[in-house]
Amino acid sequence: MARIAGVDLPRDKRIEIALTYIYGIGLTRSKEILAKTGVNPDTRTRDLTDADIAALRAAIDEYQVEGDLRRLEAMNIKRLMDIGCYRGRRHRLGLPVRGQRTRTNARTRRGSRRTVAGKKKPAAKK
């Protein structure tokens, strides 16, 4: 199993797909990296040579991936919250940030619904 950027890549997948297991690398960036290093995208991870793996590591080190990228995103959100802008306040309150409606349909961001005790209906008389 090839280990790149602290992630074990699956052995049986094509390297083009396997690289997307690294946080911060999607299919487009994976194709860019493979084109730059000259590795065939259809090669399986288990068939890569040590030279190929070294070239992939060097190419991926040029990007911010995994922990560095997660830390950068967290710092950006924290900066927004510290300066007190609208987006920062929405993050702090756990509400949608990008203008979505909240009267209904914000369940993913707000969490599951809190049940409120309601008025019981009287039993039907016969």
From Swiss-Prot:
Coiled coil: none annotated. GO terms for molecular function: rRNA binding; structural constituent of ribosome; tRNA binding. Part of the 30S ribosomal subunit. Forms a loose heterodimer with protein S19. Forms two bridges to the 50S subunit in the 70S ribosome. PROSITE patterns: RIBOSOMAL_S13_1, RIBOSOMAL_S13_2. This is Small ribosomal subunit protein uS13. PANTHER family: 30S RIBOSOMAL PROTEIN S13/40S RIBOSOMAL PROTEIN S18, SMALL RIBOSOMAL SUBUNIT PROTEIN US13M. Located at the top of the head of the 30S subunit, it contacts several helices of the 16S rRNA. In the 70S ribosome it contacts the 23S rRNA (bridge B1a) and protein L5 of the 50S subunit (bridge B1b), connecting the 2 subunits; these bridges are implicated in subunit movement. Contacts the tRNAs in the A and P-sites. Belongs to the universal ribosomal protein uS13 family. GO terms for cellular component: cytosol; small ribosomal subunit. The keyword Transit peptide does not apply. Signal peptide: none annotated. The keyword Ribonucleoprotein applies. Keywords: Ribonucleoprotein, Ribosomal protein, RNA-binding, rRNA-binding, tRNA-binding. GO terms for biological process: translation. Residues 96-126 are annotated as: Disordered. InterPro entries: Rbsml_uS13_C, Ribosomal_uS13, Ribosomal_uS13-like_H2TH, Ribosomal_uS13_bac-type, Ribosomal_uS13_CS. Residues 100-126 have a biased composition (Basic residues). The gene is rpsM. It comes from Thermosynechococcus vestitus (strain NIES-2133 / IAM M-273 / BP-1).
